Design a protein with these regions (language model features):
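Non-catalytic DNA-recognition/assembly elements of restriction-modification systems
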Residues: 276-281, 297-303, 393, 505-644
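Short beta-strand element of Class I
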Residues: 36-37
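Generic, well-ordered alpha-helical scaffold segments in large soluble proteins
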Residues: 2-6, 10, 41, 45, ...
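Active-site-adjacent structural elements in folded domains
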Residues: 15-25, 32, 417-419, 483-488, ...
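Signature of N6-adenine DNA methyltransferases within the class I
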Residues: 4, 42-84, 91-336, 443-456, ...
Length: 644
C-alpha cells in the first residue's frame, strides 16, 4: 500500500526531457529497494550478487547507490537461535519495521533442497520452530514453507518453486494438512521431472502459490487497522472459495520461452475439499472421481494378505558377498560344505512382469551370529580361526575385504557376517517380488526360495490373484497417481502406500478364474523365456552371435524377416552369411520362435480377460474403463484392448 501511495505522488519528467523517464524509473526502483524489498540468504556470495544485481537496476547517474546492507542480508532463514547456528536470523528483530505493520505482503523464493540426512544436528531446533510441519524425515524446504507463512501478514501471498515430493511423500503429511486447513492454496503447477529449469540438478519442480489464512484473535488484531476494508472480503473468500487453480505440464512439453501461456493453457480447477493430509492428487475432477472409486473398492493389501512389504538383504559390501556362478563353483569346488550358504539372489533388474529372470548370480548368506548358532558365535578372539576352519574357501574369499567389511555399518556380530535379519525364513516361502524403483509395472512370482538384494522388496504370499491385480492396467493407472515419482518418471512403491493399496474383493467364481489366468500367464512367461534362451544358445553355437542385440533378446517380438536382419546386424557387415545359413535362420524361426509367438498371442488374450476381471472387481463401468485408457500413463502393461 505504501508503495502505491509513493508511486501516485511521483510525477515523471516529460518524456522529451533527456533521461527523464529513465530517471523516474530508477527513482521508483530505489523507493522499492528502500521500503519494500527484503532478502535473506545463507551464502554471503549470494547476498553480494543480489545486491549488485539490484544496484544495476536502480542506479542513477551521479547519485549514491541505495544502501542495501539492512534489506539484503546474510542469515539462516529457518534457525533463529544463535546457539544452534551463529548465522541464525530472527526475522522479527532484524526486520522489525515490517512486523510493526503485521508482516510481509508477499514472500517469493526457491528454497534450497537439503536432504534430511544432513539436518541431524539441527532437527531438535527445527521441531521447536516448526511444530506444525515437522517430520524427522522431512527435507529442509518443508520448513521454508512454514517460515514463509510465519513471516507473512494474514492475507499475504507466498510463491515458492520447490520439488513436488511434499505432495505425496509421508514426510509431507503435516505440511499438506497445514496448507489445506490453515491457508488458502491459490495455484499449484506441477512440471514432473522437468530438467529445463535446473539442467544440472535432478529435480521435480513445482510452483505453489498460497495465501496466508486470516486468523481469529491475534491475526485479526494485526490487520484490523490497515486491512479492515479487506477483512470481510478475505474471510468470505476463505469460506466460499471452492477451487484451486492447477496446472500439470508433462516434463517433455515444458517450454521456458512460452511458460506463462503453457500454464494458462494447461490450467483447470479442482475442489479445495479434495486436499487434506493424505497424498494429493492434482487431477481433473472426472479422473479424481475414478481414483476415489478405485480407492473405495475392497480392503487394504495388508489386511487382505497379512503380508507386509519386506526389503531384500543389505550386505553393506556387495563386492564381497555377491558373486557370479564361476566364483560360486570355485568356492564350492574347494569346500563342498559351503554350498548351502551360497544362494541364488535377485537384483532389481531381474524382476520382470510375472516371473523373475535370474541372472545366475549368488549371495554368500552368512547370517549374523545373532540369528544363527554358528560354531564360532561365542568364541570371541577365536571366532575367526573357527570360521576359517569350518568354511576355508569362504574365509579365503572374504579375507581380502576384511578392512572394508569392518567399516560397514551393516554387519553382523563378526566382520564376515551379514547384518542381523529377523526374516531369513520368509525368503524360502512363495512370494511376490517387485523393484524398489519401478519403470514398468512388474510384479513377479518367486517360488524358488531366491534371496533378494536391497533393491528388491517382496510380499510373502502365494495369493496369485493379488499378482494379477498388481500387474493390471487399472493398478498401474492408479499407482501412477498414487505413488511418488522418481527420476525419469519411475515410481517407488513405498511400503506404507503399497500396504494401503485397496485390493478389490472378487466373487468366488471370478477369483478362481483370475487365479487360473495368472497360472497360465506364469507358464507362458516361463515358456517364452525358455524359447529365448534356446534361440540365443543356438545362435551362439551355430552362427557365432556372441553378443546378441536387445532386439534378439526379445526375439518373440520379431517377424521372420526382422529376425534374419537382426542376426545379420549382430554378426557385423564384414561377416556375410550364405544362402544355406539364411535358410537355417528362417527354419529355426519357424520351428522355435513362431510357436512361441503364437503362445504370446494367447497370453495377450488372457491379459485382456484379466484386465476385464480386475476392472469388474473395482466396479468400473465401460465409460470409466474408457476414461482410464484415455488418460493412461506411459508404459501401460498391455496394449489398449480392442473392445475399449
Amino acid at each position: 500500500m505504501a508503495l502505491l501511495e509513493d508511486l501516485a505522488s511521483v510525477e515523471p519528467e516529460a518524456p522529451e526531457c533527456s533521461g527523464g523517464r529513465e530517471t523516474w524509473r530508477a527513482a521508483t526502483a530505489r523507493q522499492i529497494l528502500r521500503r519494500n524489498l527484503y532478502g535473506v540468504d545463507l551464502a554471503p556470495e549470494s547476498v553480494e550478487i543480489a545486491r549488485l544485481s539490484l544496484w544495476i537496476r536502480s542506479a542513477i547517474r551521479n547519485q549514491t547507490l541505495t544502501d542495501l546492507t539492512h534489506n539484503i542480508v546474510q542469515g539462516n532463514s529457518v534457525i533463529s537461535d544463535p546457539a544452534v547456528d551463529p548465522r541464525a536470523f530472527d526475522w522479527q528483530v532484524q526486520f522489525s519495521e515490517v512486523f510493526a505493520d503485521g508482516g510481509f505482503d508477499a514472500v517469493i523464493g526457491n528454497p534450497p533442497y537439503v536432504r534430511q540426512e544432513l539436518l541431524g544436528s539441527i532437527k531438535p531446533r527445527l521441531q521447536q520452530e516448526f511444530p506444525s510441519v515437522y517430520n524427522g524425515l522431512a527435507d529442509l524446504y518443508v520448513y521454508f514453507y512454514d517460515r514463509g507463512l510465519q513471516i507473512l501478514k494474514p492475507g499475504g501471498m507466498l510463491a515458492y518453486v520447490t520439488t513436488n515430493k511434499w505432495m505425496k511423500a509421508g514426510y509431507g503429511e503435516a505440511l499438506r494438512r497445514t496448507l489445506a486447513r490453515m491457508h488458502d492454496l491459490r495455484r499449484i503447477v506441477d512440471f514432473g521431472h522437468a530438467k529445463q529449469f535446473f539442467p544440472d540438478a535432478d529435480v521435480f519442480p513445482c510452483f505453489a502459490v498460497v495465501q496466508k489464512g486470516v486468523e481469529e484473535g491475534d491475526g485479526e488484531a494485526l490487520i484490523e487497522d490497515t486491512l479492515e476494508p479487506e477483512r470481510s472480503r478475505l474471510l468470505d473468500a476463505r469460506n466460499q472459495a471452492e477451487a484451486i487453480d492447477v496446472g500439470i505440464i508433462p516434463r517433455d512439453l515444458v517450454r521456458l520461452d512460452d511458460l506463462p501461456a503453457q500454464i494458462a493453457r494447461s490450467s483447470f480447477h479442482i475442489h479445495r475439499a479434495r486436499l487434506g493430509s493424505d497424498a494429493w492428487s492434482l487431477e481433473r475432477q472426472e479422473v479424481h472421481e475414478l481414483l476415489e472409486k478405485i480407492r473405495r473398492s475392497g480392503a487394504p493389501l495388508l489386511e487382505v494378505t497379512g503380508a507386509k512389504p519386506t526389503r531384500g538383504i543389505l550386505t553393506g559390501l556387495n563386492e564381497a558377498f555377491l558373486i557370479d556362478t564361476t566364483t560360486r563353483d570355485r568356492l564350492v569346488g574347494k569346500d563342498s560344505k559351503c554350498a548351502p550358504l551360497i544362494q541364488a539372489y535377485l537384483r532389481g533388474q531381474d524382476i520382470c512382469r510375472w516371473l523373475p529372470d535370474w541372472a545366475g548370480l549368488w549371495m554368500i548368506a552368512l547370517k549374523s551370529s545373532g540369528d544363527h548358532p554358528w560354531p564360532w558365535a561365542d568364541l570371541g578372539d577365536q571366532a575367526e580361526a573357527c570360521f576359517r576352519h569350518t568354511y576355508p574357501s569362504l574365509h579365503e574369499h572374504l579375507k581380502p575385504f576384511e578392512a572394508d567389511l569392518k567399516r560397514r555399518q551393516d554387519q553382523g556380530r563378526h566382520w564376515w557376517e551379514l547384518r542381523a535379519c529377523a526374516y531369513w525364513e520368509l525368503f524360502t516361502r512363495p512370494k511376490i517380488v517387485y523393484q524398489e524403483i519401478q519403470y514398468h509395472p512388474a510384479y513377479a512370482y518367486d517360488e524358488e526360495s531366491n534371496l533378494c538384494n536391497n533393491k528388491v522388496f517382496f510380499l510373502c504370499t502365494d495369493y496369485l490373484v493379488l499378482l494379477g491385480i498388481l500387474n493390471s492396467p487399472a493398478v498401474w493407472w492408479h499407482n501412477w497417481r498414487y505413488l511418488p515419482h522418481m527420476k525419469d518418471e519411475a515410481l517407488t512403491p513405498v511400503a506404507f502406500l503399497l500396504e494401503s493399496l485397496l485390493v478389490p474383493k472378487l466373487k468366488r467364481r471370478f477369483e478362481r478364474l483370475c487365479g487360473d489366468i495368472c497360472r497360465h500367464l506364469l507358464i507362458c512367461s516361463r515358456d517364452r523365456r525358455t524359447t529365448i534362451r534356446i534361440v540365443l544358445d543356438w545362435l551362439r553355437t551355430q552362427h557365432d552371435v556372441q553378443k546378441p542385440s536387445t532386439r534378439l533378446q526379445a526375439a518373440t517380438n520379431l517377424s521372420s524377416d526382422e529376425f534374419v536382419s537382426e542376426v545379420k546386424r549382430s554378426r557385423g557387415r564384414e561377416r556375410s552369411m550364405s544362402a544355406a545359413a539364411l535358410k537355417d535362420l528362417r527354419d529355426e524361426y519357424a520351428r522355435t520362435i513362431e510357436p512361441a509367438k503364437n503362445l504370446m498371442a494367447e497370453a495377450l488374450q488372457l491379459e485382456y480377460q484379466l484386465h476385464d476381471l480386475v476392472n469388474e472387481a473395482y466396479g468400473l463401468t465401460p465409460n470409466e474403463v474408457k476414461l482410464m485408457w484415455d488418460t493412461a500413463p506411459p508404459r501401460m502393461p498391455i496394449p489398449r484392448p480392442p473392445h475399449v
